[in-house]
Design a protein with these regions (language model features):
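N-terminal secretory signal peptides and thylakoid transit peptides that target proteins
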Residues: 2-17
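Active-site acidic/histidine proton-transfer and metal-coordination neighborhood
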Residues: 13-25, 40-48, 118, 122-215
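C-terminal segment of N-terminal export signals and the immediately downstream linker at the start
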Residues: 25-63, 71-72
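Hydrophobic faces of well-ordered beta-strands that scaffold small-molecule active sites
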Residues: 52-58, 81-83, 106-111, 147-149, ...
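Acidic-and-aromatic substrate-binding clefts and catalytic sites of carbohydrate-active enzymes
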Residues: 60-66, 82-94, 116-119, 157-158, ...
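Short, acidic/polar
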Residues: 61-73, 127-136
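Catalytic domains of carbohydrate-active enzymes, especially glycoside hydrolases
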Residues: 68-84
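Short acidic, glycine/proline-enriched helix-loop-strand junctions
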Residues: 91-106, 186
């Protein structure tokens, strides 16, 4: 049996992820990426110059205050901070001040929007779009990579049926969100989940195909 140390764990995890994405994606990798894996000077040691950067969700780090949480993260060498999206607009200055002078940046924003985009109720869909845009704007101010969204969890009903028409509708909605995000210097991040958590967008390939069609 293979000893499950950190290196082997990462190797097997990344191999599985690569297989999930598919051979087409692997074939599209540029020679530059391959050269980067060998190092800028063409070293034969794979991954020599690669760096694993860790990020914590706000609720993971212990501490009574944001500064205490960030102090804990710094001691561990964590360089990414993932706050929740709920009420983020009112916390922009607080977070900026807390991060000032630290080697920590805002990574992704963990949801926090209201409603859900695949609801059969137009009012609930609008609530989702409006609150997502509010969070996206705040994410842009914080220099965040993007805002995470799941189209609909299993418990969110009634929802639009799993049809091509629904997929087309979803592309339209995400195109609007994505355009808004680009205007604010950030992005919308899809989060595929397993069937026990959501009924739509369960595979990385599904998310990738949406990105392709939205362009």
């Amino acid at each position: 049996f293979m000893t499950l140390n950190r290196r082997n764990f990462l190797r097997t995890s990344l191999s599985g992820a690569a297989l999930a994405v598919g051979s087409t994606a692997l074939a599209s990798c540029s020679s530059k990426s391959a050269n980067t894996a060998k190092g800028e000077k063409g070293s034969d040691k794979p991954g020599k110059d690669l760096e694993l950067k860790l990020s914590f969700q706000e609720g993971i780090a212990p501490g009574e205050s944001l500064n205490e949480k960030l102090d804990f993260m710094e001691k561990l060498g964590v360089v990414g901070f993932e706050p929740g999206g709920g009420g983020l607009a009112s916390r922009v200055n607080e977070i900026k001040q807390a991060l000032n002078g630290r080697n920590i940046k805002v990574s992704a924003i963990c949801a926090g929007f209201k409603g859900f985009i695949l609801s059969t109720d137009p009012a609930i869909r609008k609530e989702c779009m409006d609150t997502m845009k509010e969070i996206i704007a705040a994410a842009g101010e914080l220099g965040s990579t993007g805002v995470i969204i799941v189209p609909a969890f299993n418990g969110q009903v009634p929802a639009l049926p799993h049809t091509m028409e629904t997929r087309d509708f979803l592309c339209e909605q995400f195109n609007e969100m994505g355009t808004f995000a680009a205007q604010h210097g950030t992005s919308v991040i899809f989060e595929p989940l397993n069937r026990k958590e959501c009924f739509y967008l369960r595979q990385v390939a599904d998310a990738a195909s949406l990105c392709r069609d939205i362009n």
